[in-house]
């Protein structure tokens, strides 16, 4: 089972991933928590280069292919082996983040980026079983991030950028509602977990 958690900045992806993982471990399930970009040694090094480039200005296309390179390695090295071993894999961000951030917000084109995302996984289609979209007004999400007082380059973008991010995620969910569970990220973590467990109960039954 492959579950992806998506959402804009400050939506609580890491908190939901950990809480969901804890819930499933308590049910004696094997769980792997991971993230993108990152999730493996090469991926984490690319993450550092993308999010905090050392006095470098990455072009939009260079940045896109760094994300895709991280994903290609992550899928082959971590995600597929874990799924084969019977793990439930919970990943913070996947294809949709790339389509929304690089395709929509950065202006490279959603269809162009989606096509590249489909190719980077190889000849066999590889999509999550469930996409959990944490939706939150961009200004509230940024307020949450500002409390942390440490920002990557995307979190430093203007509010208009983050509004495009939110609209992009919602447009993807609206276009393919069977793939998504859209959650109000302002709700309590306990409420979110209840909704996720209800939504996924058939897929997660032993």
From Swiss-Prot:
<dbReference type="InterPro" id="IPR018094">
    <property type="entry name" value="Thymidylate_kinase"/>
</dbReference>
<dbReference type="Pfam" id="PF02223">
    <property type="entry name" value="Thymidylate_kin"/>
</dbReference>
<dbReference type="GO" id="GO:0005829">
    <property type="term" value="C:cytosol"/>
</dbReference>
<dbReference type="GO" id="GO:0005524">
    <property type="term" value="F:ATP binding"/>
</dbReference>
<dbReference type="InterPro" id="IPR027417">
    <property type="entry name" value="P-loop_NTPase"/>
</dbReference>
<keyword id="KW-0547">Nucleotide-binding</keyword>
<dbReference type="GO" id="GO:0004798">
    <property type="term" value="F:dTMP kinase activity"/>
</dbReference>
<keyword id="KW-0545">Nucleotide biosynthesis</keyword>
<keyword id="KW-0418">Kinase</keyword>
<keyword id="KW-0067">ATP-binding</keyword>
<dbReference type="GO" id="GO:0006227">
    <property type="term" value="P:dUDP biosynthetic process"/>
</dbReference>
<dbReference type="InterPro" id="IPR039430">
    <property type="entry name" value="Thymidylate_kin-like_dom"/>
</dbReference>
<dbReference type="InterPro" id="IPR018095">
    <property type="entry name" value="Thymidylate_kin_CS"/>
</dbReference>
<protein>
    <recommendedName>
        <fullName>Thymidylate kinase</fullName>
        <ecNumber>2.7.4.9</ecNumber>
    </recommendedName>
</protein>
<keyword id="KW-0808">Transferase</keyword>
<dbReference type="GO" id="GO:0006235">
    <property type="term" value="P:dTTP biosynthetic process"/>
</dbReference>
<dbReference type="GO" id="GO:0006233">
    <property type="term" value="P:dTDP biosynthetic process"/>
</dbReference>
<feature type="binding site">
    <location>
        <begin position="7"/>
        <end position="14"/>
    </location>
    <ligand>
        <name>ATP</name>
    </ligand>
</feature>
<comment type="function">
    <text>Phosphorylation of dTMP to form dTDP in both de novo and salvage pathways of dTTP synthesis.</text>
</comment>
<comment type="similarity">
    <text>Belongs to the thymidylate kinase family.</text>
</comment>
């Amino acid at each position: 089972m492959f579950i992806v958690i998506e959402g804009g900045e400050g939506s609580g992806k890491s908190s939901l991933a950990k809480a969901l993982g804890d819930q499933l471990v308590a049910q004696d399930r094997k769980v792997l928590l991971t993230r993108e970009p990152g999730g493996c040694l090469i991926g984490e090094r690319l993450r550092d280069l993308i999010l905090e480039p050392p006095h470098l200005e990455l072009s939009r296309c260079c940045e896109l292919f760094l994300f895709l390179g991280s994903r290609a390695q992550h899928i082959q090295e971590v995600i597929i082996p874990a799924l084969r071993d019977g793990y439930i894999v919970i990943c913070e961000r996947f294809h949709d983040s790339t389509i929304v951030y690089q395709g929509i917000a950065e202006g490279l084109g959603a269809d162009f980026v989606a096509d590249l995302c489909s190719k980077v996984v190889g000849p066999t289609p590889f999509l999550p079983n469930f996409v959990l979209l944490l939706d939150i007004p961009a200004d509230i999400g940024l307020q949450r991030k500002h409390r942390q007082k440490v920002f990557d380059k995307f979190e430093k973008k203007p509010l208009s950028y983050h509004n495009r991010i939110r609209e992009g995620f919602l447009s993807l969910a609206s276009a393919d509602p069977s793939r998504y569970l859209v959650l109000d990220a302002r709700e309590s973590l306990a409420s979110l977990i209840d909704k996720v467990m209800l939504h996924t109960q058939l897929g997660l039954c032993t």
